[in-house]
């Protein structure tokens, strides 16, 4: 039973510590994270996954106004 408590505490802390550092690499490139269904225009403004969450990608901030959602 103690093992379950330790496992829960570890998982809780692992997910709790993520938001403070989230998307730092994407923001440094001048981007923002969007769902993968969004098409960044021009294509050169699509930085790929970078450090965005699962099924999201990094697009340059200026391309948001031109983004097309599928």
UniProtKB/Swiss-Prot annotation:
Gene Ontology CC entries for this record: extracellular region
Broad class of the protein's primary localization: secreted
Biological-process GO terms, alphabetical: envenomation resulting in occlusion of the pore of voltage-gated potassium channel in another organism
Tissue expression: Expressed by the venom gland.
Keyword Signal included in the entry's annotation: yes
Keywords, comma-separated and alphabetical: Antimicrobial, Disulfide bond, Ion channel impairing toxin, Myotoxin, Neurotoxin, Potassium channel impairing toxin, Secreted, Signal, Toxin, Voltage-gated potassium channel impairing toxin
GO function terms (MF aspect): potassium channel regulator activity; toxin activity
Disulfide bridge map: 26-58, 33-52, 40-59
Keyword presence, Signal: yes
Signal sequence, start to end: 1-22
Pfam family, one: Myotoxins
Subcellular location: Secreted
Additional remarks: This myotoxin is the most abundant transcript in the venom of the specimen analyzed in PubMed:23025625. Individuals of C.adamanteus from populations in southern and central Florida lack this toxin in their venoms.
Family: Belongs to the crotamine-myotoxin family.
Function per UniProt: Cationic peptide that possesses multiple functions. It acts as a cell-penetrating peptide (CPP), and as a potent voltage-gated potassium channel (Kv) inhibitor. It exhibits antimicrobial activities, hind limb paralysis, and severe muscle necrosis by a non-enzymatic mechanism.
Subunit comment: Monomer.
UniProt name for this protein: Myotoxin
